[in-house]
């Protein structure tokens, strides 16, 4: 069983390093524009790009895992191309992802050249992750820039499959941090009630980047999930 990890807004594949180093048959993608290539303007476009990526590599026995914006991409992929997948892993995400203006405004200001609030936002997002990881990830996210984050946030803001998510019939692992302020636990609870073959895990003392804050806990959950659908 192979796993492909999809990052969140303004991110890049290396945020999944605790997972890709742990799971030998796994890798993480960089979505277009993060930093190379042209940014995509909707979750639907990202899904179609990911389908081409997967098809070109002839991936089989595949599990898709996504965080936040990446989770939205994985959910919609499961609806459109269920035949490609054995299961999905959704971390810190939801069936609808409205984005508060307090997250949009710093990106907009940074694009105009006023980066202070955006730098604060990026640093706050990684606040609870390990120190060495945090320092490197913040620098990489700043290098990718505010335009990518804003574009991704706007994709999230228009994403809504609340009336369709029940159509997902494949096994799903849903993980969220108990203290996640960006995608509260109620988002995960909704997915857990609507996706028939799902397992919900709320991780104590963890926030939006639960997979980096509590990698041992998350990796064990992923390992058990993949083992369960492989047997």
Give the predicted meaning of each segment.
Residues 45-62:
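Conserved acidic catalytic loop of the alpha/beta-hydrolase fold
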Residues 1-37:
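Conserved HGGG/HGGXW glycine-rich cap/lid loop of the alpha/beta-hydrolase fold
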Residues 179-183:
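Acidic catalytic loop of the alpha/beta-hydrolase fold
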Residues 168, 174-176:
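Short beta-strand/loop motif that positions the catalytic acidic residue
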Residues 75, 79-80, 85-115:
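Flexible "cap/lid" loop of the alpha/beta hydrolase fold
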Residues 66-70, 74:
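Gly/Ala-rich beta-loop-alpha elbow adjacent to hydrolase catalytic centers
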Residues 98-102, 115-166:
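Conserved alpha/beta-hydrolase catalytic His-Asp/Glu region
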Residues 206-219:
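Catalytic histidine-centered segment of alpha/beta-hydrolase-like enzymes
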């Amino acid at each position: 069983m192979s796993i492909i990890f999809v990052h969140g807004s303004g991110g890049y594949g290396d945020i999944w390093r605790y997972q890709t180093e742990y799971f030998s048959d796994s890798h993480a993608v960089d979505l277009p524009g993060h930093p190379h290539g042209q940014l995509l303007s909707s979750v639907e476009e990202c899904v179609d790009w990911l389908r081409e990526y997967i098809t070109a590599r002839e991936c089989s026995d595949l599990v898709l895992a996504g965080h936040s914006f990446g989770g939205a991409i994985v959910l919609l992929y499961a609806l459109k191309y269920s035949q490609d997948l054995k299961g999905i892993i959704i971390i810190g995400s939801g069936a609808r992802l409205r984005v508060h203006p307090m997250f949009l405004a710093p990106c907009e200001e940074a694009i105009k050249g006023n980066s202070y609030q955006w730098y604060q936002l990026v640093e706050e997002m990684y606040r609870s992750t390990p120190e060495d990881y945090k320092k490197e990830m913040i620098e990489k996210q700043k290098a990718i820039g505010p335009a990518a984050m804003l574009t991704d946030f706007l994709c999230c803001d228009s994403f809504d499959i609340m009336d369709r998510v029940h159509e997902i019939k494949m096994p799903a692992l849903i993980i969220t941090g108990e203290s996640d302020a960006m995608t509260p636990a109620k988002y995960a609870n909704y997915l857990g009630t609507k996706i028939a073959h799902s397992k919900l895990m709320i991780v104590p003392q963890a926030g939006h980047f639960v997979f980096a804050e509590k990698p041992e806990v998350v990796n064990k959950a992923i390992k058990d999930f993949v083992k369960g659908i492989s047997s």
